Amino acid sequence: MKDLLRTEHLSRADVDLLLDTAADFASKPLRSNTALSNKTVAIYMTKPSTRTRLASETAVAHLGGTPIFIRGDDLQLGRGETIADTAKIISGFCDALIIRTFKQSDVDELGAQSSIPVINGLTDDDHPTQLLADWVTIRENFGKDIKGRKFVYLGDGNNMTHAWLIMGAIMGAHVVAATPDGKWAPDAAIVAKAKAIAAKSGATIEVTTDAEAAAKGASVLYTDVWMSMGDPEAERAEKMKALAPYAVTENLMKLTEKDSIFMHCLPAHRGEEVEASVIDGPKSVIWREAYHRRTTIQALLYHLTRGELKGN
């Protein structure tokens, strides 16, 4: 597999390899590694970022490479140059590309037209690098045996929900998405895809509107911001009202297992999708989760540039 364009492209063997490598990088954070020595990685972002940019640049540096950060308005794409032409130019100068943008189709085309590995750092439809960081964190807390555990996402049925369901299906997990019906529910096609993967992996995929039922007995409660970049501001009041029952509160956390954890991909809006007492409380693992953005991107670059991921 040359690229990581979508979460669904990963096999279970790929994920296990990446998580093991990320855990190794985390245990030896200052170990010298020259996998990207004399190599350059382009980091192209049309969406502002804190974690993805920092994680990507430090991941490249930890592997001995040189990162080049490119803003959306730095390229000629905005003036009519094609994605195909841009992909060929970047491929000629760089050894890998990490992209964070809006349209999944742009990432897919960049992957198809590039001769170098392309990594999806986030789109409106998917967020594979975040899910790898999430699962390293889950394994640190619960180990590799997840039998009998339930992993629950609450809130907007967005790109994180999609990636959460797909990765959970790949991992053979019991995953739940608790979201409103209608326009803020996860894409039905993605849910169907997750269930198809689950039929082979033994996973259990649930989508519900009942936040309390979802939280009961959960090992993980996970959420994301309610207003993502690009969401229409005119819908804010309506969306906030629809999502209010899915806020992660102390009362909701009381329904979970004794050893449960709270996760959030960040940035967070305390008082909206999560209470401050939860995200800043003893069950929150958000800082370690954010740290693993670097270790997992580092693992991706290490294995993709060596041609060691097989895909599904």
Task: Annotate the PLM regions.
Residues 1-54, 58, 126:
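Positively charged, low-complexity intrinsically disordered leader regions
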Residues 46-58, 142-223, 231:
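Glycine-rich phosphate/diphosphate-binding loop of Rossmann-like nucleotide-binding domains
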Residues 63, 93, 113-115, 171, ...:
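Short, structured coil segments at secondary-structure junctions
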Residues 95-167, 264:
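Anion-binding alpha/beta catalytic cores of soluble intermediary-metabolism enzymes, centered on
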Residues 195-277:
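Rossmann-like adenosine-cofactor binding region
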Residues 259-260, 265-312:
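Adenosine-phosphate binding glycine-rich loop
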